[in-house]
Amino acid sequence: MFDFFISLINSAIYGLYNVTVAIGFPSYALAIIFITIILKVLLYPLMAKQMKSMMNMQEVQPKLLDLQKKYANNPEKLNQEMAKLYKEYDVNPMAGCLPMLIQMPILIGLYTALREYQFEPIEHATFFWVNNLNAPDPFYILPILVGISMFLQQKASMGKNNEAMENNQMMKTMLYIMPPMMVFVCLALPAGLCLYWSIFSLLGIGQQMIMNKQKEKQMAIIEARRAEEAAKKAEEEEERKKRQ
């Protein structure tokens, strides 16, 4: 099954390389960039669904806190009510992991394919200072670019909640430990894979900025709903006191 996946990647590289030949700019590096753009477009619906699920999770947070207080001594009932609430608001707690789970086999497949790919002619398998996309970047520029672009993408994903997000231990790890670790890992990886990864992250920054604007609009709607619900509860409480 994995061999078929690698064969598919090889075919995509060769097919898109032929496209670059047809447009008069034969380049395997450009073919890899095309693959990156195509994958980013294909994965966008998952990213959008992830953002929607996160927004729904924020909307449902006050109700979750109420349930946790109500069923503090009944974990089984709490889990049942939380499941109902997630279903009602279309929340998937695992939605944030899905894009990464899909991305990992793609990275492994690209690593295997690029390590063994026979670039012909080899002079078309260059990228500025890189003489061979099969080999590691001799000047470590692409690995460093991977780290920087990953850091910036994580920063962009925090939106305007930087301080709150940075206080989260997991987010701290993702933001400050993962990028340097990826730089170290990428030092030994084929330059073609580092090119894919850095372009994917750079595109992700632009994508995240667009999604952040959508998120701000959605958050404004959520805050308006919360204010409306709070006003309604206060009104009901006032009526109850009057009846007493």
Task: Tell where the protein language model's regions lie, with residue ranges.
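Helix-loop-helix
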Residues: 1-244
